[in-house]
């Protein structure tokens, strides 16, 4: 009961922070750290994921909880007094499936995660008043499906147009810290919080036992990283596009951004080409580079007498965003509409993971396999089950059934499981059918 009241108190305090930021949009807030007390730290700990990999100190949640009150009180005192020292993050490289490449991820210590969460709980209510409606990534009450819906409705209302598919090269590694300091100055000038943010930015990364201190960027994987990236691109892209670009355009335009994935759509081709020309210069001013091949202009007008069957490939007539390929197709009433289907790379990755799982777990009890595969299918439907994507999720469900049958057949030397026998098994251990969960018509 006490913890519930504490959470309610924190929510009220965050609401007051939000109200202050909303009423004074140009004010730099100088006294914020006093909000972070022991109650705040306990709530930050509650919200922190505790099942992830450990940081450089090797401390697990179980170890930290042995003296939780004392540990949080000590962390709070070090934070307030300035004695807190940010340890380096442990860098690991995660394979990018199907590419042979890797993506670096920084793993903070548990204590770092807790303090970052506490600071985020202060910063988030403030910046939520500033961030624009075009930004959807890692924000309360927003997510990829809201971004997809906004994009769909925007493109449909514009009747399609010209799309800039934006790709920022190594965003987290090249973010300029001096510019970040300038952006932070506009809103947050509390000495304790700014000092701590600086320590995180300069803590370095530990890789193969050596600590490196890159001059640019911020470690990917920290609790504080999403709000930092949102702030940076809010200043570099969102505000610039809304206040400097759009007023100079001839036609309508829109921006949809999810973290560092962004897409710009224009009704007028000349507008799109002019913006595409200046984008590299704009990003270059802030230390960022656009990928020269992946950043491209797509003619995303609906097919017509002069464009239908013009010989362009599907890639030239479509674009991918948030795991979906967007293209024009006919509705049931015969009208051209923007349609979405699971991107080929995402479908291949999902099936590859199912194959790996079935191979490893083929000797588990059939009931246990059914439960796990059902969970995987429902998770797939929960994300990819959107209007117009029924064919792709049905194909995924069918492939999962085939993969399961294949690996069940290899449980013994008795021979391949016939479809007749397997169908009887499916009646006893059914898998959930494909289901559309998100409808664009419900928004």
Tell where the protein language model's regions lie, with residue ranges.
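Non-catalytic terminal/accessory segments
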Residues: 1-443
């Amino acid at each position: 009961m006490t913890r519930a009241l504490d959470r309610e108190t924190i929510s009220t305090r965050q609401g007051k922070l939000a109200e202050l930021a909303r009423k004074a949009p140009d004010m730099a807030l100088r006294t914020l750290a006093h909000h972070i007390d022991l109650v705040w730290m306990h709530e930050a700990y509650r919200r922190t994921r505790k099942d992830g990999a450990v940081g450089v100190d090797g401390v697990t949640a179980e170890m930290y909880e042995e003296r939780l009150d004392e540990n949080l009180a000590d962390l709070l005192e070090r934070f307030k007094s300035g004695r807190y020292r940010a340890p380096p993050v442990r860098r690991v490289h995660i394979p990018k499936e199907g590419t042979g490449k890797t993506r670096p991820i920084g793993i903070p210590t548990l204590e770092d995660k807790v303090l970052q969460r506490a600071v985020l709980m202060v910063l988030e209510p403030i910046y939520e008043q500033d961030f624009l409606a075009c930004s959807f990534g890692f924000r309360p009450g927003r997510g990829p499906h809201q971004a997809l819906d906004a994009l769909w409705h925007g493109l449909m209302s514009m009747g399609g147009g010209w799309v800039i598919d934006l790709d920022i090269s190594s965003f987290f590694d090249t973010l300029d810290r001096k510019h970040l300091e300038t952006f932070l100055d506009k809103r947050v000038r509390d000495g304790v919080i700014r000092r701590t943010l600086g320590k995180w930015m300069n803590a370095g990364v530990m890789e193969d036992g050596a600590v490196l201190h890159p001059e640019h960027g911020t470690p990917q994987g920290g609790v504080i990283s999403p709000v930092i990236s949102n702030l940076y691109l809010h200043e570099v892209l969102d505000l610039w596009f809304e206040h400097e670009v759009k007023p100079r355009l001839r036609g309508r335009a829109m921006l949809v951004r999810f973290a560092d994935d962004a897409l710009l759509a224009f009704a007028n081709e000349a507008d799109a080409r002019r913006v595409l020309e200046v984008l590299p210069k704009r990003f270059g001013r802030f230390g960022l580079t656009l990928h020269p091949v992946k950043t491209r202009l797509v003619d995303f007008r609906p097919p017509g007498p002069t464009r239908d069957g013009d010989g362009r490939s599907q890639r030239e007539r479509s674009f991918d965003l948030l795991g979906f390929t967007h293209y024009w197709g006919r509705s049931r009433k015969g009208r051209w509409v923007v349609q979405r289907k699971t991107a080929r790379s995402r479908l291949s990755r999902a099936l590859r993971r199912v194959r790996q799982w079935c191979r490893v777990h083929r000797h588990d009890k059939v009931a246990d396999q059914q439960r796990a595969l059902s969970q995987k299918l429902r998770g797939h439907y929960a994300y990819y089950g959107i209007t117009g994507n029924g064919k792709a999720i049905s194909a995924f469900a069918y492939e999962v059934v085939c993969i399961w049958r294949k690996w069940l057949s290899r449980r013994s030397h008795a021979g391949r499981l016939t479809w007749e026998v397997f169908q009887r098994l499916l009646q006893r251990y059914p898998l959930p059918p494909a289901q559309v969960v998100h409808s664009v018509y419900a928004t």
